[in-house]
From Swiss-Prot:
Pfam families: Ribosomal_L29 (PF00831). GO terms for molecular function: structural constituent of ribosome. The keyword DNA damage does not apply. The keyword Ribosomal protein applies. This is Large ribosomal subunit protein uL29. Belongs to the universal ribosomal protein uL29 family. GO terms for cellular component: cytosolic large ribosomal subunit.
Length: 67
């Protein structure tokens, strides 16, 4: 998911996405441990999506403090 797409979402939607990404990362790590993971690059992608989502949430938090 691109950062621009994340900026278009509401704060509640972002928080839900963050939970979904973390859940997916948990499942991917479990698959990796049991050697059932077909695409290990997906772990990296999900981690980056988590970081992007947290960044957008933090930016909104800082904007709210300024206002």
């Amino acid at each position: 998911m691109k950062a621009k797409e994340l900026h278009d979402l509401s704060t509640e939607e972002l928080q839900k996405k963050l939970i979904d990404f973390k859940d997916e990362l948990f499942r991917l790590r479990f698959q990796l441990a049991t050697q059932q993971l077909e695409n290990p690059m997906r772990i990296r992608d999900v981690r980056k999506n988590i970081a992007r989502t947290q960044t957008v949430l933090r930016q909104r938090e800082l904007e709210a403090q300024k206002a």
